[in-house]
Amino acid sequence: MKPLPSTNGKVNGNGKHHDSSLSSTSSTSSSSSSDTQFNISDRYGDFLHRLDTLDTWPKSNEQILLEPYTYLNNIPGKEIRSMMIDAFNHWLQIPRPALEIIKKIVGQLHTASLLMDDVEDDSDLRRGVPVTHKIYGIPQTINTANYVYFLAYQELSKLKPCLSSNASTDLWSLVNDELLQLHRGQGMDLYWRDSLTCPTEEEYLQMVNNKTGGLFRIAIKLMIALSPLTETPDYLPLVNLVGIIFQIRDDLLNLSSVYTKNKGFCEDLTEGKFSFPIVHSIRADSSNHQLMNILRQKPTDIGTKTFAVSYMKDQTKSLQYTREVLTCLEEQAIEEVTRLGGNPALESIFELMHVLPSPPATDQH
């Protein structure tokens, strides 16, 4: 029998069919393999000695990584911490270059913590614009926030030469201890929210002292460490008091109409957060479960939130109670400033922070 003809090959002298396409493929494969081996050898043969060329970080990459941070940092905030640093420098007399480094460190830590807070609270607005993770996504926002924490530590090394030769202060431990406190406070705040556990006022104040007071203490402790003065009074009780005033004030304003533009309408209720007025209201009448059930629902509608604010205002008088607590704490802070020798800049900050009577948030939003 004759071999069948093929359109793709020839019949050799032995009558066997020879597939030219297979021969061509084999030849191409061999050639390709040779080229690949040449390219790999050429590219990676001396790779060990070229590794240092990979150890570069282009400025363009840095800008990409920091874009979520830059987005929020470029939106004006309250700047209370920066103002506090300047005010305390009336007493501590830190040289301006070191003071600016401290401001930068505290600013980095503060903005990074806000990036994380907004993710953890699933917020919509921050400073009147969409929160960072709604634009850049949660993974990139978290990574950037963590990166900025380490940038702050990098800045910290610039303060080491500013310490006096006999100073034994460990700046890294100082900052680390306060960041631990900050995360402890934040952790309890999140636990109460997610487990629907209403803390006592005392537990709430302890949480705030850890969480909000942490960045204030970092600033003042760094300033004390770098102060040229041989002796300084104990400023930390005042610093802690200011942190608590700041947070309770923030809690009150969140339920006020003046806060709606920047943070949204009664956002603490939507987050299910146990703020100072909410804690008081729940504890004031434990037989009434309306407010707890509203927090459980994490309402987004204006009607439910307006009802909750009216309940706190009219039934448990919690807004008035919060205002009276703030007034009491502000008076103590002013007395402490006077005892420490007076400080016009701090007194101006207290005047700025004082909450005047304002209408609670209503459904006329």
From Swiss-Prot:
Binding site for dimethylallyl diphosphate: 126, 211-212, 247, 254, 263, 273
Biological process, per Gene Ontology: isoprenoid biosynthetic process
Entry EC number(s): 2.5.1.-, 2.5.1.1, 2.5.1.29, 2.5.1.10
GO molecular function: lyase activity; metal ion binding; prenyltransferase activity
Binding residue positions for Mg(2+) 3: 250
Record's keyword annotation contains Nucleotide-binding: no
Effect of residue 254 to S: Leads a reduced GGDPS activity to about 40%
UniProt xrefs under Gene3D superfamilies: Farnesyl Diphosphate Synthase
One Pfam family named in its UniProt record: polyprenyl_synt
Entry keywords, A to Z: Isoprene biosynthesis, Lyase, Magnesium, Metal-binding, Multifunctional enzyme, Transferase
Catalytic activity: isopentenyl diphosphate + dimethylallyl diphosphate = (2E)-geranyl diphosphate + diphosphate; isopentenyl diphosphate + (2E)-geranyl diphosphate = (2E,6E)-farnesyl diphosphate + diphosphate; isopentenyl diphosphate + (2E,6E)-farnesyl diphosphate = (2E,6E,10E)-geranylgeranyl diphosphate + diphosphate
Cofactor: Mg(2+)
Enzyme class: transferase
Family of this protein: Belongs to the FPP/GGPP synthase family.
Biological role: Geranylgeranyl pyrophosphate synthase that catalyzes the trans-addition of the three molecules of IPP onto DMAPP to form geranylgeranyl pyrophosphate. Does not show any monoterpene nor sesquiterpene synthase activity.
Listed name of the protein: Geranylgeranyl pyrophosphate synthase
Organism: Melampsora lini
The gene coding this protein: GGDPS
